[in-house]
Each structure stands twice: as structure tokens, then as C-alpha cells.
Amino acid sequence: ADLACASDADMIEIRLDLLDHVPDTGGMETVVTFRNGFDASLLPKGFNGYVDVGEEALPDIGIRTISSHHDFGGTPSSAEIVARLDRMESDIAKGAYFVRDFRDLAGILEASGPLKKEHVLLGMGPMGTITRIRQSTLGNNFTFAHVGEPTAPGQLSLEEMRALGEN
């Protein structure tokens, strides 16, 4: 978290499955990710970022929400991706899928067109890295990069993303 706060990232993610508190982010836009159940008491007073709660439904608590689905086993059809993400009751729907072949990659690309809500679509693994580089092609609100160790297969460092330019 300290590395992320000291970086020139546009936004940082604080994963509360890896930390036990939300550190001072110095006013940077922040995504606080809860993988073990939402606990509002862990958020600092006046929190003004996003909360990612997986696919858990949250009551309206006045905080922007991200629902996320991760499939490390592969990529479902584009129709399944669209149906799942459009059902998510959040401000932004996130889907991250392990890309095994070009068919999986095509499924992610095809899903980006018909999605009705704000979203982040990512491919994981070596073949999925292109979705992180060309994230604007998918209509993504943002993408994820690391400043220390990757937290997902195929995730690039912030330095690598900056070298590749804004896409």
C-alpha cells in the first residue's frame, strides 16, 4: 500500500484480504477490496472511493461499488459474461477471466460491446495481458497494474503500463 501511495498511479487498490486496515492514501482515488465479507467499520471516515465486494450485494450506503467475478479456470461465452456482469447490482461490474486461447480472448472482446453498465473486463494469464494494455478498446472504466508483486496472472507493472502509453 505504501508503494502504491508513493507511485504516480491514478488510482490505488487496497486489498483487505492482504491488509488489516485502510492506510492513509493521501487523497488518491481508492478501491478498497473486501474478499472476506464487507465491513464498513474498516473504512476511514469520509471515505470517497470505491468498494469492491466480489459478488456480494450491498445495501445503499452512499459509497460507489464494484461487483467483481474472477474465473481462474477459463473464460465463459461472451453471452454468459454479459449476462453475469449486467446482473451485478453495483456502479461498476468487473469480470476477470483466465484466457487459455484465442477463442477465450475473442469472448472477452465480444462481451464488451453489449454490456449495458460501466465495467472493467480483464483477461488473466499471458494471453490476457493484451486486455490490460488495450483496456480502452473494451470500454473499461480503468485497469489494474501492480507496483510491487502482481496480484493476478498477466498483470503488468505500473512502469510497464506507463511505458506502453495510455490505451
Regions inferred by a protein language model and the residue ranges of each:
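Structural recognition of alpha->loop->beta junctions
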Residues: D10, S41-D52, R84-A93, R134-Q155
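Short, structured coil segments at secondary-structure junctions
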Residues: G26, G46-F47, I61-I63, L115, ...
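Short, acidic/polar
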Residues: A1-S7, D39-P44, T75-D86
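A short, acidic, amphipathic alpha-helical segment used as a generic capping/interface helix at domain edges
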Residues: L85-D86, R103-G113
